[in-house]
A protein has these predicted regions:
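Long, contiguous interaction/recruitment modules in multidomain scaffold/adaptor proteins
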Residues: 2-111
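Flexible helix-coil transition and linker loops at the boundaries of alpha-helical arrays
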Residues: 103-107, 141-151
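Structural motif corresponding to the intra-repeat A-B loop/turn of tetratricopeptide repeats
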Residues: 126, 167, 200-201
Length: 205
């Protein structure tokens, strides 16, 4: 679905800034689009008091803001606020919202490590490599590390290496790829290590 807003549509005087994406939103349609296409971000506390205030005062949607306040104070699953917004704004069809609800449910069925990896991968795709590393390392720092397979652990270290390479911190990238190879002898990992030595001759195999 392509987001297309009429130039004659109501526009708030103070757009809402979503720091994680580095964008401003200025309509309920844009908010729904962001939520629908970034479910992990929506699950990570996107809907807070500041956003609810924006919905009430800038979008002039007091009824929706009131429903969100009630849900927030009731102690219900915070993710219900996501669905309230999608349902009340009528930007997506009931079928689309149903598919989105299934996507959220699939995330909730994941283990803590798997969900954290999905979140890290999300930030990696956004090229927010520093944030991605924080989430990848959170998995490794967790005591559950002993229950992770060597294959999964190798993937985490590989992605840490790719993240560091993305910010040109080649020494850190080399160390991470080395760790990945220690857990799983993968030829692709060796290729990445070799490529790093070409980018930085001071690094050695």
């Amino acid at each position: 679905r392509q987001l297309s807003i009429s130039v004659t549509a109501f526009r708030p005087s103070h757009p809402y800034y979503i720091e994680r994406l580095g964008i401003h939103i200025a309509s309920s349609q844009e908010l729904c689009y962001v939520i629908y296409n970034n479910p992990l971000l929506a699950m990570e506390g996107l809907i807070n008091d500041n956003l609810i205030t924006f919905i009430r005062t800038e979008l002039d949607m007091a009824f929706l803001a009131g429903k969100l306040d009630v849900c927030k104070k009731s102690g219900e699953d915070p993710d219900e606020m996501i669905f309230i917004i999608l349902q009340e704004c009528y930007y997506y069809t009931a079928r689309e919202i149903g598919k989105f609800r299934q996507k959220i449910a699939s995330y909730k069925k994941m283990s803590a490590a798997e969900l954290t990896k999905e979140t890290a991968d999300f930030y990696f795709r956004l090229k927010q490599y520093g944030t991605a590393v924080i989430y990848y390392e959170k998995i490794l720092d967790d005591w559950r590390i002993k229950s992770l397979s060597d294959e999964f652990t190798a993937k985490i270290w590989n992605n840490i290496g790719a993240s560091y390479a993305g910010i040109f911190w080649f020494e850190k990238a080399m160390s991470a790829f080395d760790m990945s190879y220690n857990f799983q002898k993968n030829r692709e990992t060796l290729k990445k290590i070799y490529q790093l030595t070409l980018l930085n001759p001071e690094l050695t195999l």
